[in-house]
Amino acid sequence: MTEYQYPITLQADTVANFRRDGFVKTADVLNAQELSQYAAAVDAEVARRTVMDTRSVSDKTTYEQSFIQCMRLWETNADVRPLSCHPGLAGMAAQLLGVDSVRLWQDQALYKESGGRETTAHQDETFWPIGTAPLISAWIPFDAITIHNGAMAYVPGSHKAGPLRTVDITHRSEAYDILSDPKLGGNKPQWVDVDPSAVVWHDGFTVHQASANKSTDTRRVFTVVYIASNAKRIKAWPCFPLDREEIAVGERLRGTGMPVVWPPSMELPEPPVMVGETSGPQQTVQRS
């Protein structure tokens, strides 16, 4: 498919399982040294961005009680950049999607604090005006994760239903019960325990959720979202990464904020000049 050699070549059954179920766990992707290095970098950036927020979980909004969310860390922390642009991960994403090239759509830290509530079941891709572009998330844990401390559950085959009704996971309005959608055919979520060094992948249309964190420690997870390089903007509604690059409806993705990460470049990409809010979903507010 490409003249570049994948740093990590996936087995055919791994790819087949992903395309059948819409999610797959891949073991032993990152070694202990890499994990320690990247976890320290992400921890430091999350701490820097949230240093002024001293609220307890109970004092936060319903959405914020699900997790501390810090997005596009690669843009503001050079030590996180090698993880967000990791050629091994990007190559795996391309193989799973069956495309020659992928861009970095976003990264984010999702740190579910002790006592943090469950994350409501939803699809990712319906949040963004990109239609049905091939899109995949890498869910990278820095700690062992079970249903006790914030594991993910995925509805097998739900990606084949395509875009369903968008779920308001901010809970500013009543969240749609997507698990009862008839297009899911009654399929139930499957909980996935995961150890550090493994990565769980899910399609942009896979319905997924996370359990509450009943442990005494913060559940630390970093995600990287990849999108096919030739994807286009389909609708005009506000979307931070597309608005920042002034991408019009019908135009292909471009710009320093969405760099091509597979095939890899010799050097890590330079971050954009304008970056988003320090925490939360980063919609249209920008700061220099």
Describe each region flagged by the PLM.
Residues V99-D100, E125, I130, I140-A151, ...:
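Active-site region of the double-stranded beta-helix
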Residues D100-D107, R117-T119, P134-I140, G150, ...:
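Generic beta-strand structural signal
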Residues M1-D21, T26-A121, F127-P129, V167, ...:
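Non-heme Fe(II)-dependent double-stranded beta-helix
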Residues I145-Q209, A231:
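Double-stranded beta-helix
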Residues P129-I147, D193-V194, W201, V225-S229:
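Short, conserved beta-strand element in jelly-roll/cupin
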Residues T126, L135, Q209-N213:
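Glycine-rich phosphate/pyrophosphate-binding beta-alpha loops
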Residues M52, V199, F205-S288:
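Non-heme Fe(II)/2-oxoglutarate
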Residues Q106-Q108, Q123, I140-A144, P156, ...:
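Short, structured patches in soluble enzyme cores that scaffold and shape functional sites
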